[in-house]
Design a protein with these regions (language model features):
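A polyanion-binding, active-site-adjacent surface
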Residues: 2-196
Length: 200
């Protein structure tokens, strides 16, 4: 089958040319995502930040450094779409608000999410990163706070894992909730090794 006939590539081409939200994106349109029909791990984030908007590389920032450390993966594995898919709730940088980046645009999920999720039949683990991703992917089990949802991570394990956003802005949260890095991160790393070693 030619690349042009590949449903994943066809859909990615459409997504990357989407400008539906252009009037609401002060820095312009630049959808950032990666996936393959063979992806085994799915990372569901919020939306690209300013640096990622500039480079077009998902999690190419301090948040990504921490996320890769939590997962215990190399850059080579992280950016290999055959292994890891990255599908933020919003594909474009939404701009800055008074207290950080604005929330992801809701249009992305409405327009593309179900179609894209259907193109990844081999996902064994979904990392659900931050409150916006949790609200969509764990809507039935979302607790009153992100902390409460993450504390009940075993209820979704080993196929899904809600985690806080790895942004440096969450350093205080991580200090207050040391159990995350002592209990959850080692389990995550073991699961990632198990999945990737099976399919390497």
């Amino acid at each position: 089958m030619k690349t042009g006939d590949n449903p994943v590539q066809q859909t990615l081409k459409k997504v990357r040319s989407c400008d539906y939200c252009r009037d609401h994106l002060p820095h312009g349109v630049r959808p950032v995502l990666q996936l393959s029909a063979n992806s085994k791990i799915l990372i569901v984030g919020q939306a690209p930040g300013s640096k990622v908007h500039e480079t077009g590389i998902p999690f190419d920032d301090p948040s990504g450094d921490r996320l890769r450390a939590w997962m215990g993966v190399t850059n080579a594995d992280f950016y290999n779409a055959e292994k890891i898919a990255i599908l933020p709730m919003g594909f474009c940088y939404p701009g800055r608000g008074k207290s950080g980046d604005l929330p992801p645009r809701e249009e992305c999920a409405k327009l593309w999410r179900h179609e894209l999720m259907g193109l990844m039949p081999s996902i064994e683990l979904t990392l659900i990163v931050g409150q916006y991703a949790i609200a969509w992917h764990l809507s039935h089990a979302k607790q009153d706070t992100l902390t409460a949802t993450v504390k009940r991570w075993r209820e979704h394990w080993p196929n899904k894992l809600p985690i806080p956003h790895p942004s440096p802005r969450n350093n205080i949260w991580l200090k207050k909730n040391a159990w995350f890095e002592t209990d959850v991160v080692p389990a995550l790393q073991q699961r990632v090794v198990s999945i990737l070693s099976t399919h390497s």
